Structures are given as C-alpha cells and as structure tokens.
C-alpha cells in the first residue's frame, strides 16, 4: 500500500520551475500568501525555459520612456506591439489577453532582467526594446528572483502526478519525490499550473522532461484546453 510521507499545507501551490511558475510564485508571495513552488527538476535549471533562451522584450515606447533605456526605439509603441502579436497569431488570439500582456509585461521583463544582472547574467539589448539571453542565463535569473523573495518554500525533483479536488474545486495535488520514490500531498487554497508545454511528440526530441503533465492533469480535473 502506497502511503503519503509528507503533507504540506499552503495558501498557494505553484507547479512548475520555469518562467511562468517562478514569476507566479513571486507575485503570490508579494501579496502575502504562503507559497509553495514544486518543480519536477531543479528550479531555474529544467524545463522549457532553459532550452529556448532567445529574445525577451517590450515595446520600445515603454523601454525608452518608462525604463529609460537610451538605445530603445520609442517609435515602436504599445499599439504597434499589440498589432504585431495579433498578426503573428493570424488574428485568432484573445485580444483582451494580448492587451493585458502588452500593458503588464514590460514591468515583468525589466524586473527579470534586473534579477539576471544581480545573478551575473549577460543580457544583450537590441532595438526596439528587446534583450537576448541564453536559456541558462534566464533560468539563473528566475532562480535569483525566487530566492530574493525569501518566503517561498521550494520542493525540487518532485513530479506532480495528479490534482486533488473537493467537488468542482481543486484543493491541492499529489507528487512523487523522484529520488526517494515517496509521495507528498500538497493541500492549498489556490493551485497554479505553470508547467510549460508538451515536447515529446516523437521519440527523439531535445527536451524529454516536457511531457505535458500540466495539460493532462488539468484535463483530467475537468478543465477545458485551448
């Protein structure tokens, strides 16, 4: 009979270890919520985030006027970025979400860059308002942000295998410690899935730990997937 080795109680349970999960955990902790962050691998050193690297940015208008980046191009406005994102999505994107992204992402992008600077990572700027950074550099930046917050409880190398429900409400999750083989039960008032995408659609791939856990758990719990 499989038994639960440890029960963890918290206000907010965040599942994942990359960009979405780390920034969600930081935001939760800043609101005063007791926050637990659970990752299948090492936080900031696993998943999609360290694989992609690449470009992170904002509109040039915000970069120049709000964050005082002298090299930025202020002629590339928020409206330009909004249109660019919608066009890239063949105008099928939820435009309310795109608008929210355009308005709120500059603050997050700049703060993550500051975390990276404190962690000794190199971000290369290019116009209109973008930075290039390696995937490893982005991971170290995110880890610095989580560590700076101080109050976030971390559980690494724990694979969440299912969500817990009470009626229609998700109340936590069960995970397996990948090195000890024991089960942990997490009970929370709120649960955030920030587990990234699904990579292994073929036997040979570059990111074998991206197995679609979050999407599968959400679907089994009754969520509608887009």
What is each PLM-predicted segment?
Residues 13-15, 185-196:
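Short hydrophobic core segments
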Residues 4-7, 27, 33-34, 40-182, ...:
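Conserved N-terminal/central alpha/beta ligand/cofactor-binding core
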Residues 12-37:
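N-terminal Rossmann-like FAD-binding beta1-loop-alpha1 element of flavoenzymes
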Residues 1-11, 19:
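Generic start-of-chain signal for non-secretory N-termini
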Residues 24, 142, 214-217:
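Hydrophobic residues within alpha-helices
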Residues 190-226:
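Glycine-rich loop(s) and the adjacent beta-strand/alpha-helix scaffold that form part
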Residues 9-11, 157, 188:
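Phosphate-coordination loops involved in phosphoryl transfer and adenosine-cofactor binding
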Residues 17, 48-53, 205-210:
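Active-site nucleophile and cofactor-binding loops and adjacent substrate-binding regions
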């Amino acid at each position: 009979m499989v038994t639960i080795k440890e029960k963890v109680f918290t206000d907010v349970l965040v599942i994942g270890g990359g960009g979405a999960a780390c920034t969600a955990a930081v935001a939760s902790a800043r609101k005063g919520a007791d926050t637990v962050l659970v990752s299948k691998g090492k936080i900031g050193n696993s998943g999609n985030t360290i694989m992609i690297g690449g470009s992170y940015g904002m509109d040039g208008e915000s970069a120049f006027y709000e964050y005082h980046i002298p090299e930025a191009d202020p002629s590339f406005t928020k409206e330009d970025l909004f249109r660019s994102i919608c066009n890239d999505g063949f105008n099928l994107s939820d435009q309310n979400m795109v608008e929210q992204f355009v308005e709120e992402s500059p603050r997050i992008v700049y703060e993550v860059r500051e975390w990276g600077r404190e962690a000794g990572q190199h971000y290369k700027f290019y116009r209109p308002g973008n930075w290039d950074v390696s995937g490893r550099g982005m991971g170290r930046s995110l880890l610095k942000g989580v560590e700076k917050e101080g109050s976030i409880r971390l559980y690494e190398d724990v694979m969440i295998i299912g969500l817990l429900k009470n009626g229609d409400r998700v109340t936590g999750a069960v995970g397996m410690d990948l090195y000890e083989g024991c089960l942990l039960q997490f009970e929370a008032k709120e649960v955030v899935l920030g587990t990234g995408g699904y990579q292994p659609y073929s036997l040979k791939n570059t990111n074998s730990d991206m197995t679609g856990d979050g999407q599968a758990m959400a679907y089994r719990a009754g969520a509608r997937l887009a």
